[in-house]
Amino acid sequence: TFLVSLSLEADVIRTFPLGPGGAIGQPQALGVPQGLGIADPSAVRAVEMAGSSFLIVASTGSSSLSVVEVSATGSMRVTDHVVDTLDTRFAGVQALATVSAGDRVFVIAGGSDGGVQLMTLMPDGRLLLLGGQLDLPGLALDNVSAITARLVDGQIEVFVAGEGAGITRLTIDIGPVAPMQTAGPEDGLLTGTEAGDLLLGRDANDRIEGGDGADILIDGAGSDTLVGGAGADIHVLGQDGERDVIADFPDVVANHQFAVD
């Protein structure tokens, strides 16, 4: 068990081991002195994903979200670090919420950017953008200061407080979510279900078929073939130096997303 703290002055994240009786041990630190580009860390959430422990850290001054894997000894390793762009809505981020749904982890973030951003955490600790909500008349999403989110009947209920009057309630329909599947060590077929699948390739040459749901297909280190199928799918391609094929590309351009590592 660890206690986690953020330092505005030093721009670092610290993990403190908790011993018998709640005794606090010597901390380990990760931040600007170790090369992590954060300024004014403002919020942190701890999540579990694929058997690993991660911290999601929001930093107001750098308009960034950092994902840090924490080992059993409390040592920290950065797995992703993303900075707000014109395509996202977390500049000046200071509010952060996470929701777990089965094997999935969803992240909602907001700040001074006139909206909120929805992401999901991939098994390797990277963040994948899913969408966002702009501030519109009748909403209070300007200068977001607090976000709370819960999973209710298969949907994510989000409550956001900001500079505007009132509290904004957003409902995110994630649809039915299937357990995560990982390809085997040999060349083969990995098939999804009718629900929303998270399908992960490995080192072999895999064929990954999503099926009917809104799926996330992540290629592995081999030469892979990805078939999204019906539904609004996301294909994630890594820089592995291998030739990968999205087999149903002509059919999916209008409704699918693509991400390249």
Where on the chain are the PLM-derived regions?
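Feature marking well-ordered beta-strand scaffolds used for ligand recognition
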Residues: 1-178
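Short, solvent-exposed coil/turn segments
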Residues: 39, 91, 142, 183-185, ...
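Acidic, glycine-rich calcium-binding repeat modules characteristic of RTX/beta-roll
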Residues: 187, 196-261
